[in-house]
Regions:
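Membrane-embedded transmembrane alpha-helical bundles that form the catalytic cores
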Residues: 1-345
Length: 345
């Protein structure tokens, strides 16, 4: 806030790299991996923009997407097949999707002016969102990167969001997590049905306050730095259907899958069987993005079944009678988190 305007991006970039180094201090080689990712993605973007024709643009986009997915597959999913997981680099799931989105937006010519490496690096490494999102796109911060000024209202709003987010995490999420841990300590086969439901409801609110708290802190910190980061949650537990829920929960992830996977596959403007295929692909990918385990794959499959059933059978009824939708979601939301919460499958 007191830094001269011409130095703001350089100072933020250096500070973000220092933050990343602190986060991976036990395995500092991960900082080198992250720097390589920054450099090569910036170069890949320039390489693709300079392509002579559409065929070469597609080839270079494919190379860029493959380059970004390989480290994610090795670090996050190799343990799924070998049984021996690796320590994850900080934020790799988030910055991998951020980089892929950057390349696709360049390919689609949605980024009109190719940025300097300093602007790109500042955007890609911005420390408030690095560990838990939101997943940024270039358009989210393009204007702020070029010229930003922190006003009194920015400070007020940033501190408010930071405080609320911190309270959600410390006062609510951390306290609720203890109840679900007690369920696991007793053993799922030994607990009573009422206590199992109580534990599951506690987990339902714990994961909300935990993730929303982190996201709100990121938005607040971004505001204090002069950036207007996208909101990630919009009262998801007030949704009347699972379809609506996922438009309100982790919205930057949902919009990423919509724009870069679902719509390119054909979206909903296709035959019924292709629509089912598109939904299955998106929700299985959503599941395994959250973690490398059979429970996450099962969770993604359950979401597919729920949302496909709504689309083909009763979504119009839920939208017509909101009271019925709220009752339906009061039961379905805790049950939908069960495969996510129980890792031993």
């Amino acid at each position: 806030m007191v830094c001269p305007a011409k130095w703001k991006n350089l100072v933020l970039f250096a500070g973000s790299l220092a933050f990343y180094f602190y986060g991976v201090r036990k395995t500092p080689v991960y900082l080198i991996l992250f720097l390589i990712s920054l450099l090569l993605n910036w170069y890949l973007g320039a390489w693709m923009v300079q392509a002579a024709d559409e065929k070469h643009r597609k080839q270079r986009l494919f190379a860029g997407v493959l380059f970004n997915l390989c480290p994610l597959m090795v670090f996050k999913y190799s343990g799924f097949f070998t049984g021996r997981g690796l320590l994850l680099p900080l934020g790799i799931s988030f910055y991998t999707f951020q980089m892929i989105g950057w390349l696709v937006d360049l390919y689609r010519r949605e980024i009109r002016v190719f940025p300097s490496f300093l602007h790109f690096g500042t955007w890609a490494s911005m420390w408030p969102h690095m560990s838990s999102g939101p997943i940024l796109r270039w358009k989210d911060t393009e204007t702020d990167l070029g010229a930003r000024r922190v006003t009194a209202s920015d400070v007020e709003e940033g501190l408010r969001e930071l405080t609320i987010g911190l309270a959600m995490k410390v006062l609510l999420a951390n306290q609720l997590s203890g109840l679900w841990q007690k369920v696991g300590a007793i053993g799922y086969e030994s607990i009573s049905t009422p206590f199992a439901w109580l534990g599951l409801i506690a987990f339902t609110f714990q994961i909300y306050f935990d993730f929303y708290g982190y996201s709100l802190m990121a938005v607040g910190l971004g505001r204090l730095l002069g950036f207007h980061l996208p909101e990630n949650f919009h009262y998801p537990y007030m949704a009347c259907s699972m379809t609506e829920f996922w438009r309100r929960w982790h919205m930057t992830l949902g919009s990423w899958f919509r724009d870069y996977v679902y719509i390119p596959l054909g979206g909903s403007r296709c035959s019924r069987w292709k629509l089912l295929r598109n939904l299955l692909v998106v929700w299985l990918l959503t599941g395994i993005w959250h973690g490398a385990g059979w429970n996450f794959l099962l969770w993604g499959g359950c979401l597919f079944v729920m949302i496909a059933a709504e689309k083909f059978l009763y979504l119009k009824i839920l939208n017509r009678y909101p009271w019925l939708g709220h009752l339906y979601m009061m039961i379905l939301i805790p049950l939908s988190w069960l495969p996510f919460a129980v890792a031993e499958i």
